[in-house]
Amino acid sequence: MNEKTHNLQDTFLNHVRKNKTTLTIFLVNGVKLQGVVTWFDNFCVLLRRDGHSQLVYKHAISTIMPAQPVQLFEPEANGEEG
């Protein structure tokens, strides 16, 4: 890793936001939401679908599943996985 500490959560959310990746978000109460992240901060995520936006608090999120595979970092040159 380089000098900057990578925050996986922010890296993931920024990647799916920039690529407009459709996500399925499961909340802790079992509700399933789908849409595209248009904005996020330390406490919440703005999810957009069919022209409507939903502000979702991160503490209510259980799982985030992208519709397609996401590669956040380049594979290391030494051949190690993970």
From Swiss-Prot:
- One GO CC annotation, please? cytosol
Matching entries from PROSITE patterns are given as: SM
**HAMAP family, per the entry:** Hfq
Q: Which UniProt keywords apply?
A: RNA-binding, Stress response
* Chain's gene name: hfq
SUPFAM superfamilies given in the database record: Sm-like ribonucleoproteins
A single Gene Ontology MF term assigned here is: RNA binding
According to the record's subunit comment, the protein's assembly and interactions are:
Homohexamer.
Name of the protein this chain belongs to: RNA-binding protein Hfq
What family is this? Belongs to the Hfq family.
Q: Name one GO biological process term.
A: regulation of DNA-templated transcription
List each copy of the Sm domain by range: 10-70
Superkingdom, according to UniProt? Bacteria
Species in which this protein is naturally found: Parvibaculum lavamentivorans (strain DS-1 / DSM 13023 / NCIMB 13966)
